[in-house]
């Protein structure tokens, strides 16, 4: 198996052939592994671990045996054996590919193979999913196979405490969402003790729905933030003004770029409302952002589409999946403006404490791989951003899906009436229907139409996400109608006749059995239950095939072709029949922005009635062109986010690297002494730049030194004394030597006194705590300043300067100043302890391992996401 990693450098076609060869070799071992007893199969884990961890073999060397072991275990535990294409997909994941596998090809089972193989190294495997439910389900479901083979699995869920998280990360295989992994990374880099750390490195990640996580969510950075006081009154004031402003008279809106611009008439109106003379005067300058945000909240953010109001809180809805994004908040004041608009409690505006983009988080991993059903449209971005190649894995059976042409109506009302009519006809013959909508609002509108017609149906949107898996599991049954926002329910197969695995699991849980809490009883009951449900499902599936399989009906085109393809891909899995169609109207968002007015005018000229559809290649091509435009614009936006974050990323790596060294270092005294030297050197260089003693700025120097540690002599005593030759002939190097000797002597005295009171170990702990506090404080201030710099950097383009180059240059200067500030402030904080000792004759020294009050406040702050 040596040399298999060369596969990464081959063209996709050649790579897929090599993956097929590996799959054949794994399947050739089937007879040998089938004969093994359970004990012999389970013993393979320790044997393979030893060969990798002790004998020096590579994971490539043991791939065939590890895959054959996990494949046979899957059959014995789940009753499912990997097809050839699933083994190919698993091998692709091991080699760091994005394995593109169509919907229904069994990506979850595929993941078992590379997760098992890579876990044998003992360095940990992270399996990343899009939501908590899927993470928990996969950890339980696929965890049954891994646990059978003697590996530990665990899951990171939003409610878990640090101890539970640490335990989960110490498992061989850890499941969780991208948010949980990313936020734990940020929290680890705010920790003040090694005991507070939860993650144990970034060895290998398998990202499920890789396009959703690495592309759709990549524009939104992960942000841990803390509240800033005293701004809610202005959000309320402008929320009251915004409805009085008229679009195109007081302000303009660019729907494509999602920006607003206030016109002169709008400025005058606002000045009159607030009773001020000049909105742009320095003392009122911050009010401009409140005004812009109130207009954005009014025009660009729609309730039940972009967000919902739940329990008095504004909760964001993912524009791509329709799922609610608990814990995330829009940044830059947008979230507060929406809260003011909806008359709910306005939570304090937040200051960034730690942040990272998903692009840069996932690039921390030594090896990264992913799975998706639709990667071809994003292959270039996956390659350029993450260095990930796409391997298109063939389907297990031929695809029999029939994709009908789009039907286009003049109005949304006519479109939805036609949709309801089509659904009624399908229900009549018992064909299951999955309807995709783009917002909560539209899914509920269609639901009301279906209720009026007496059509039974399930609604799957952000408001009802708890029952997601159960609803999707039943969506392929005879006569089932499921209305879902976008790709809600992704990750759960729609199986004709019902998903037997999910239905059996639900049945067992209703009987009080659980694969984690009561594993033995669950496994004992599983075989009989799954056999019964599979028999029922199989019989019903035949009837569903006879009426045409699953009918997928899209009610609007999405900005991204990939999201449309994902919806279509829910139909005709594993060689089943299936059918799809999109219903559109000239008032749909995408049509309004790109083709609507021209086509609507043409339909009016041709006297086409509202309730009559057209199927026009011209419109279809215009939609494809519009989608390509939007995809390109979004790609550029993500690239732009990444370019700016690259600057922050380099700085973040330096700061987080230094923090980790401080936490892990036995002794930071040398570092403190070095900081003392660097700070005094910088002071002396600044004061003696003129060269001659009489031109030196010694008053300013001594003021700075007094603030830092308090020299034991005056500059007059030093210059006029004869220690360094004749009076007045002091050199700058002699001045520096004298000050360093004095400062180090004072620091020695501090050490002695603290050691007397609390022991030398406490002195080292105090140094570490002081250094960490200052690093965190200065880093927070730096993040704020970098945010401020980025907000205004676009204006540099007006001066014919490249904003990115200016951001890099100024950001670099600010970072260097911050590092100097860390040195200076750390030394100052420690000498303050000496001053307290001198005044009080004793000092109370906190044990840094027990925590730090300031840090505790930070950790308790709200975790949010900017957008």
Swiss-Prot record:
It comes from the Bacteria. It is an enzyme of class 7 (translocase). It catalyses: ATP + H2O + cellular proteinSide 1 = ADP + phosphate + cellular proteinSide 2. Keywords: ATP-binding, Cell membrane, Cytoplasm, Membrane, Nucleotide-binding, Protein transport, Translocase, Translocation, Transport. Pfam families: P-loop_SecA, SecA_DEAD, SecA_PP_bind, SecA_SW. ATP binds at residues 86, 104-108, 493. One of its GO terms (molecular function) is ATP binding. Its EC number is 7.4.2.8. GO terms for biological process: intracellular protein transmembrane transport; protein import; protein targeting; protein transport by the Sec complex. The keyword Cytoplasm applies. InterPro entries: Helicase_ATP-bd, P-loop_NTPase, SecA, SecA_CS, SecA_DEAD, SecA_motor_DEAD, SecA_preprotein_X-link_dom, SecA_SF2_C. One of its GO terms (cellular component) is plasma membrane. It is a peripheral membrane protein. PROSITE patterns: SECA, SECA_MOTOR_DEAD. It is found in: Cell membrane; Cytoplasm. Monomer and homodimer. Part of the essential Sec protein translocation apparatus which comprises SecA, SecYEG and auxiliary proteins SecDF. Other proteins may also be involved. Belongs to the SecA family. Part of the Sec protein translocase complex. Interacts with the SecYEG preprotein conducting channel. Has a central role in coupling the hydrolysis of ATP to the transfer of proteins into and across the cell membrane, serving as an ATP-driven molecular motor driving the stepwise translocation of polypeptide chains across the membrane. PANTHER family: CHLOROPLAST PROTEIN-TRANSPORTING ATPASE, SECA INNER MEMBRANE COMPONENT OF SEC PROTEIN SECRETION SYSTEM. This is Protein translocase subunit SecA 1. It comes from Corynebacterium jeikeium (strain K411).
């Amino acid at each position: 198996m040596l040399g298999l990693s060369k596969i990464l450098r081959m063209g996709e076609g050649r790579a897929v052939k090599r993956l097929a060869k590996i799959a054949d070799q794994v399947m050739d071992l089937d007879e040998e592994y089938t004969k093994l007893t359970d004990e012999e199969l389970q013993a393979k884990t320790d044997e393979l671990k030893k060969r990798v961890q002790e004998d020096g073999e590579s994971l490539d060397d043991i791939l065939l045996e590890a895959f054959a072991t996990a494949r046979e275990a899957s059959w014995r535990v789940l009753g499912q054996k990997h097809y050839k294409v699933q083994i190919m997909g698993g091998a692709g994941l091991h080699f760091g590919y994005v394995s593109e596998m169509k919907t229904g090809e069994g990506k979850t089972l595929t993941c078992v193979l590379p997760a098992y193989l890579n876990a044998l190294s003992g360095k940990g495997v992270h399996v990343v999913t899009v939501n908590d439910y899927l993470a928990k389900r996969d950890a339980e479901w696929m965890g049954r196979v891994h646990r059978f083979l003697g590996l530990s699995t665990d899951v990171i869920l939003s409610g878990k405490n640090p101890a539970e998280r640490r335990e989960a990360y110490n498992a061989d295989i850890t499941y969780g969402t991208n948010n949980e992994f990313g936020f734990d990374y940020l929290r680890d880099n705010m920790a003040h003790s090694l005991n507070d750390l939860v993650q144990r490195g970034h060895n290998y990640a398998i990202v499920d729905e890789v396009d959703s996580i690495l592309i759709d969510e990549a524009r939104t950075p992960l942000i841990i933030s803390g509240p800033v006081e005293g701004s809610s009154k202005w959000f309320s004031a402008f929320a009251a003004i915004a409805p009085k402003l008229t679009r195109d008279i007081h302000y303009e809106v660019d729907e494509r770029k999602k920006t607003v611009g206030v016109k002169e008439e709008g400025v005058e109106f606002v000045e009159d409302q607030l009773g001020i003379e000049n909105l742009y005067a320095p003392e009122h300058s911050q009010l401009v952002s409140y005004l812009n945000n109130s207009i954005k909240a009014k025009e660009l953010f729609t309730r039940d589409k972009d967000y919902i109001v739940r329990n008095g809180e504004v909760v964001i809805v993912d524009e791509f999946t329709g799922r609610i994004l608990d814990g995330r908040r829009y940044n830059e004041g947008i979230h507060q403006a929406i809260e003011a608009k909806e008359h709910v409690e306005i939570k304090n505006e937040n200051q960034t404490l730690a942040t990272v983009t998903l692009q840069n988080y996932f690039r921390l991993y030594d090896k990264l791989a992913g799975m998706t059903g639709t990667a071809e449209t994003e292959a270039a971005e996956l390659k350029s951003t993450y260095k990930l190649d796409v391997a298109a894995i063939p389907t297990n059976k031929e695809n029999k899906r029939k994709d009908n042409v789009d039907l286009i109506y003049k109005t949304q009302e006519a479109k939805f009436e036609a949709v309801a009519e089509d659904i009624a006809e399908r229900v009549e013959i018992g064909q299951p229907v999955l309807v995709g909508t783009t917002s909560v609002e539209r899914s509920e509108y269609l639901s009301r139409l279906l209720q009026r017609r007496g059509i039974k149906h399930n609604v799957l949107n952000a408001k009802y996400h708890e029952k997601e898996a159960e609803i999707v599991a039943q969506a392929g049954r005879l006569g089932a109608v499921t209305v879902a926002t976008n790709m809600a329910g992704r990750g759960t197969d729609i199986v004709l006749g019902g998903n037997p695995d999910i239905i059996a699991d639900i049945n067992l849980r209703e009987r009080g059995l659980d694969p984690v809490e009561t594993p033995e009883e669950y496994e004992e009951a599983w075989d009989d239950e799954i056999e019964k449900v599979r028999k029922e499902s199989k019989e019903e599936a035949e009837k569903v095939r006879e009426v045409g399989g699953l009918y997928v009906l899209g009610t609007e085109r999405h900005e991204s072709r990939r999201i449309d393809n994902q919806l279509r891909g829910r139909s005709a899995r594993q060689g089943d029949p299936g059918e799809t169609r999109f219903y559109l109207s000239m008032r749909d968002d995408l049509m309004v922005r790109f083709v609507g007015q021209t086509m609507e005018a043409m339909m009016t000229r041709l006297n086409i009635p509202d309730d009559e559809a057209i199927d026009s290649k011209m419109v279809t091509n215009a939609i494809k062109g519009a989608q390509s435009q939007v995809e390109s614009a979004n790609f550029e936006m993500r690239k732009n986010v990444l370019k700016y974050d690259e600057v922050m990323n380099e700085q973040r790596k330096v700061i987080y690297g230094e923090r980790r060294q401080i936490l892990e270092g036995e002794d930071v005294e040398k570092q403190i002494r070095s900081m003392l030297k660097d700070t005094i050197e910088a002071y002396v260089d600044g004061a003696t730049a003129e060269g001659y003693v009489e031109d030196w700025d010694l008053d300013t120097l001594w003021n700075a030194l007094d603030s830092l540690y308090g020299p034991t002599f005056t500059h007059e005593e030093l210059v006029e004394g004869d220690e360094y030759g004749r009076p007045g002939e002091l050199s700058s190097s002699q001045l520096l030597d004298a000050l360093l000797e004095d400062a180090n002597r004072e620091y020695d005295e501090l050490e002695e006194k603290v050691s007397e009171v609390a022991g030398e170990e406490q002195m080292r702990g105090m140094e570490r705590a002081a250094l960490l506090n200052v690093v965190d404080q200065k880093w927070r201030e730096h993040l704020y300043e970098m945010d401020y710099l980025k907000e205004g950097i676009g204006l540099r383009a007006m001066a014919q300067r490249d904003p990115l180059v200016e951001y890099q240059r100024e950001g670099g200067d600010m970072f260097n100043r911050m590092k100097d500030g860390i040195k200076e402030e750390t030394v100052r904080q420690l000498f303050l302890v000496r001053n307290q000792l001198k005044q009080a004759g004793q000092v109370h020294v906190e044990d840094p391992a027990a925590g730090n009050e300031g840090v505790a406040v930070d950790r308790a702050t709200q975790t949010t996401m900017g957008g």
